[in-house]
């Protein structure tokens, strides 16, 4: 919601160009909170399937999360500027995509191995969220309406949370 509310308001009023700082701050906050969300999903997986050990996976999860957060903190992201470089949007999302892929694979494999009907679609919710998110990262600055894909992305995350609370 940190970026959806300003985006929706801007699109319904005077336009995105008048809300650059609010959108940028919202994107920054969301970048950090979504990284934490994926760490939490990793622990949902560990708890759900009673995983012990797997130190290498835990290190990979924390390494990708730390790298993502560090990259988000660089001033080159120019979060509050209209001309924020696409390159930094890509850089900071590479470790995030790897983190997401790790979580996707873990849930997909474990749900199949355990014949877990309740969590059988968890992996798909994450795939969908990235499917809606990647075009926004790549094209929302040149085709602002693409930013509306954040709405179905958010719906995918709601589905993720609903599965988690079953």
What are these model-predicted stretches?
Residues 47-52, 113, 128-131:
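Secondary-structure boundary elements
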């Amino acid at each position: 919601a940190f970026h959806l509310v300003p985006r929706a308001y801007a699109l319904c009023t005077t336009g995105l160009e008048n809300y650059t700082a609010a959108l940028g701050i919202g994107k920054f906050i969301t970048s950090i909170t979504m990284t934490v969300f994926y760490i939490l999903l990793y622990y949902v997986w560990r708890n759900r399937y009673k995983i012990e050990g797997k130190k290498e996976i835990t290190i990979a999860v924390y390494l990708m999360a730390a790298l993502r957060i560090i990259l988000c903190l660089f001033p080159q992201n120019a979060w509050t500027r209209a001309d924020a470089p696409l390159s930094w949007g890509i850089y900071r999302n590479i470790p995030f995509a790897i983190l997401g892929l790790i979580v996707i694979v873990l849930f997909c494999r474990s749900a199949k191995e355990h014949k877990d009907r309740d969590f059988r679609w968890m992996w798909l919710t994450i795939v969908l969220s990235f499917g809606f998110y990647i075009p926004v990262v790549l094209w929302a600055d040149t085709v602002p309406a693409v930013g509306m894909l954040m709405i179905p992305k958010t719906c995918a995350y709601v589905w993720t949370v609903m599965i988690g609370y079953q």
